Amino acid sequence: MNAVRLEWDHVGIPTVEVQPDETFVEATRVWVTNPRNHPQNLEFLRYEDDSPVTGLLRDQPHVAYRVPMGTLDALMEAADEVLLEPWEAQKDVVRVGFVRQDGACIEYMEYMGDPAAWFPAERGES
């Protein structure tokens, strides 16, 4: 999978503090901010106590990359360790999976639709 070109998207930072304009992701029970609204493309993640996310992914920052359509599953298989299996984080928009690769937490983002439609405000919702 070394030939796959990854496009940097954001850095995710775990936090316990409520952030402005958070969006709730039910599948992982985490509040996230939109990294496109941050000058350094930072995403803050605030986990609910009952979140199924544990370990490295919950405790350490992650780097997120957009991956070409059709490559997510192969990238997951090639990783040192799968931290969170792929799922549709936003229906018909983006599928994501988390891995540990070379000691780092990595999020792979495979867009199926418009990347600008990830967050409610970008879809015209509140």
Question: Model-derived features: where do they sit?
Answer:
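Mid-chain, well-packed structural core segment of small domains
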Residues: 56-89
